[in-house]
Structures are given as structure tokens and as C-alpha cells.
Amino acid sequence: MKRNKVKIVKFLEVEELKEFEKPLYERAKEALEKETLSVPDKITLRDFVVVNLVYAGALRISEACNLELKDLDLQHKNVYVFNGKGGDRLVPLPESTIKLIEKWLEIRPEWKNNPYVFTNIKGTTKPGKIRPLNPKYFNQLFKKLANETGVKLRDGSLPHPHTLRHSRAMELYDNIGNLQLIQALLGHKNIATTQIYAQVRDEKVAEMQNTITGGLINL
């Protein structure tokens, strides 16, 4: 009889994520201290906001890239995800992320008929055609951050944008433990998909127990 193996969920702990994001954070902080922002400065700030939004909302990178202005409800600290992989959903965000989005909107390039929150800073790929950011762009950004920080996943592979979503789900499970709430936030159609995070954490606990020696007096 075959045992059901727990699906591998690649994630980083909170402190590892902070270390991974540190170079981007420092560049964004330096950019905000300038009176006039260059194009690279704006790109850095945009990337920093996207990364933090994806993590805070446990979004898929494609969902963040396709966000439109009409999807923002900053007053109530929410964003609406439409046509996501798991369907439409409401995503609550912390105050810190809302402030980052507001800061981005202050410097966001204004183009006629541009519905997207995040766009290419330098222009569009085709004249008169506004396109959202390409999610593949962030694959390259993550490779760069991984090379800068040396942060890797447990299996030795490099973090990628979806790592943020997995990492946020694990953090939420550790702090909340309510799989139904996490399922709603992640937009999972099936609770079994969400239960993977609980199984992964249970396996981590089991691994830890196996490495612990001592305790009470042995008989």
C-alpha cells in the first residue's frame, strides 16, 4: 500500500524573507529620500510595492500584475481579484501595504486610458497599447535578489515569485490556524489544497521532534 506523500511546498520563514528582500528594501528606501526620482528609482519602488503586495495578500504574481485601479479599495484596505485562478475574491491588506500602494500611485506614470496599477515605467510595448507588467519580469528580479543575498529554499533551489504566496500561507497558518479563512484568502476552490500547508508544518514539527534529545529521565 502506497503512502500519500505530502506535496512539496517551497517557502521561506519570515526572517529569511526579510533577508531576501533586504537589497530591494534598501534601494527603495534610498530612492524615497531623493527629491527627484529617476526612471530606475521608480522601477525599484514599483518592484518593492509589488513584492510586498504579493506577500501581504498572498497573491499570485499574475494577479498583482493584472490589478486595475478599479480593483483598489484603499479606504477599506482591500483589493479585489477578478478572474483569478480560483475565481473572484476580496483580499484584505495591512495598513503598511496600503501606504506603499498610495506612495506608488503618487509617482505612477499617467497615460491616457491606462487602467493598470503597475505598468512599464519607460513606456508601452506597442504605441497606443497599454499592457500590464509581465509576471516573467519578476522571475529575473528574484534571481538577482537570490544572487545578492545567497538565500535559498530548503532543497537548494532559488526563491521565485510564488514563494511569497506559499510563505505567507505558512505564516498565516502558524498565526491563525484557521484553514477556512486561509482558503478564502488564497482563493483555493478546494480546502484540500489549503490543507497542504498544515501537513507541511506538521511534518516540520515531526522532524524537529526527531532531532530533540533528552527530556525527562529515561527508564
Please place each PLM-identified region on the residue numbering:
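Conserved catalytic core of the tyrosine transesterase superfamily
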Residues: M1-L219
